[in-house]
């Protein structure tokens, strides 16, 4: 029947895209890839990292008026599940970068929540910046993404604070899981 022929062609095309003859380090399988070293190591595929970033962007899109504890509760299951799936990964740098990107994104949410420069000044001073440095930072006129990656926000909202708030660190979770297994 025509329906069977159409579905057969769809399956054949899809499998052709997935199937290939190539070196192990040039193709990815189930979200993992391999390094090109003599002793190959498992790594997280670039596409998997991009898909996680897209998923987190979608989750963080509508959190501007929420408490940070609620935001962290919302993204933690995704981060924890992703870390447990990729616990076999042996590459450290992409996971460090991903953790940094998540914190950068959350600092961006906070910067947007503060909205006005006087509020930013008051909150930066409350978080430990000197008045002069907080004033320069709050009134610098740059955008939220730039400010969330700047030194003043890293100083005001360090990794220790995110750990205290309960944010799941992918690298720390993978290290903990690899010690257990």
Model-predicted regions and their roles:
Residues 1, 18-21, 44, 90, ...:
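Residue-level detector of intrinsically disordered, flexible termini
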Residues 1-6, 10-11:
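Single conserved hydrophobic/aromatic residue that forms the stacking wall/gate
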Residues 7-8, 38, 83, 87-88:
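Catalytic palm subdomain of template-directed nucleic-acid polymerases
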Residues 12-74, 78-81:
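A conserved non-catalytic segment of reverse transcriptases
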Residues 67, 71-117, 121-125:
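Non-catalytic, peripheral interaction segments enriched in hydrophobic/basic residues
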Residues 104-105, 110, 114-181:
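Extended C-terminal regions of large enzymes
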